Amino acid sequence: MQIIPHITNEIKSYIYNLAKSTEADVVITEIGGTTGDIESQPFLEAIRQVGIEQGMENCCYIHVVLVPYISGSDEYKSKPAQHSCKELQGMGIAPNVIVLRADGRVGSDIKRKISMFCNVRPDCVIENLTMPSLYECPLMLEAAGLTNVVCRQLHLETPASDLTEWKELISRIATRSKTCTIALVGKYVKLHDAYLSVMESLYHAGFENESKVEIHWVDSENLLDQERCAEELSGVDGIILPGGFGDRGIEGMIQAARYAREQNIPYFGICLGMQIMVMEYARDVLGYADANSSEFTPDGEHNVIALMPDQQGNIPKGGTMRLGKYPCITAEGTKLRECYGKEEIDERHRHRYEFNNDYRAEMQNHGLVISGTSPDGRLVEAVELPGRDFHVGVQFHPEFKSRPNRAHPLFKGFIAAALKYQQEHTITDHQPMTD
């Protein structure tokens, strides 16, 4: 196997297949890293070939470059951008548009210099400035003319863009008058980006509730008992447990779920977080002290979470994964139905284990509500506790469907419950991360 043509052909095939399968008019392909990095070279060579194969009139190369500010001399320097463009041109790619990443206005002189020495039209040098909110960037780039130069390069005749809805979103973000604190309990909290979709979904829900959302990061391995939970979680307005795999930190998550249930703090469990909710309920309400998941204790006596029956056997690990979009029926009178406002929904899944139906009736007899199931009623998709503002666990991943201007209904309901809880309780200060 060779880098060229085998790997580059595979990269191109992925791009072409995506365009064909989605019937897209335009495919946007981002090549990360820095020009000249060895890791990026096969990808850059592949997109160079795409331009030749599809015709340069059907391809627009946009190069994002850093324009650093030197405080000692109070000036922006264009040399790094010039060298980066020269490196890219040496690989056979001539940028059509150059986007200048800078903290402030670089000035017309810098833009003219980059235009001249990087061989692009002056109006194709676009500033991408540091903004108070990331969501202001589309408006900034539109005002700078990025849409016009891209459409011109691709010979696309498009109507004038209507960003009214986006402007309203920015206005809501700027005028938020409330703040709530959400504890995110997980095992990967040292790398916040591991929970990026969950973070953004919380922020989106905050926009709709006119509230800032501050995230209090909690490593589940530190939650050894209820005393530690009180230290870490006292004062938060809601607790969210996202997905994950493996047994590390599981006992701490169970402690957090117990604390949320006993203190009546809004709780949202996603995938593993739902399974944790079920395991805690089985231990502390049903009395099965050893209740667990067959993922962690394959030979356990009371595995309330188990591999689905039709997936048991000698199947490669990846083959047991339930992936993609599946329908779910919401039960009438539940928080799930209230949030969605309809009976049938569809959500994206990525899990291997499910609620063990051997314990279904017993769980329900002890108060746990099965609020969502597969259409045939066989698989439990969501559970909740009745009489709570929000104590919900879902087997699917709602964070994948949340958008800045269209918060996911479950996240929206969770933040609304957190704000209500905040009004009824004293708030304790944390050192959170803010959007």
Task: Describe the residue ranges of each PLM region.
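N-terminal beta1-alpha1 cap of cysteine-dependent amidohydrolase-like domains
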Residues: 1-387, 398-435
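Short FAD-binding loop at a beta-strand-to-alpha-helix junction that anchors the flavin cofactor
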Residues: 390-396
